[in-house]
Amino acid sequence: MKAIISLLLISAMVFSIIEPVPKKKGLQLSENERGGCLPHNKFCNALSGPRCCSGLKCKELTIWNTKCLE
């Protein structure tokens, strides 16, 4: 019985500490995530299509991974 009560109290404490992420904030995508390029590693975003931010073409390495050609 004590174990059940302790478990319930711990669960309540954990859920009260964790704040839910607002839906609007969680669904917002940055410009890069919507279809831009990932310039820090010269990899194209999967949604960017056959281009990079700098105008270079993307080479498809896998379905989700493409690399900018210089």
Swiss-Prot record:
Tissues expressed in: Expressed by the venom gland.
Pfam families, A to Z: Toxin_7
Protein name as catalogued: U2-agatoxin-Ao1t
Keywords: Disulfide bond, Knottin, Neurotoxin, Secreted, Signal, Toxin
Organism, as annotated: Agelena orientalis
One GO CC term, this protein: extracellular region
GO molecular function, one term: toxin activity
Annotated function: Insect active toxin causing rapid but reversible paralysis in crickets. No activity shown in mammals. Does not show effect on mammalian voltage-gated calcium channels.
Domain of life: Eukaryota
